[in-house]
Amino acid sequence: MKKVVPNIFLQEAARLLKDGKPVRLLIDGQSMFPFIRGGKDQVEIVPYDGVSFLPLWSAVFFCWEGQYMIHRYVGTKDGKLLMMGDGNLVRIEVVEPTAVYGILSTIYHSDGSTQDCSDKTWLIRVKWWYRLRSIRRFLIPILKRIID
């Protein structure tokens, strides 16, 4: 059974971010696997103003077609931002910069470890994972057995 977080809860998170306050959320869903494990890992999100430089490969909290989500910023096209989940194989969301409410600053893993989301080594790993998207369908099941 798929568990859906009420959009009103995430709307409140967006409001807090817009007010300049960071938020911490327990992530659900598998679209950011293997870097974020749904139902196990928490993330801290810091506000984003919609106009400042957005680092490539950063994970962001945004609204797309009325749904709030956290996905990876993978590029731009015609002044819009391209987002893709680490666990997604094909779908890329195209959003206005003003639809981004926050940037992930820290991932709190269930084993007690933390990950600084601005760490350069981390972002290089993320970039290589993005480049492997043609074989993700084979890697993800293997990683789920190892990591989950």
Positions of the model-derived regions?
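Extended hydrophobic leader/signal-anchor segments used for secretion and membrane insertion
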Residues: M1-D148
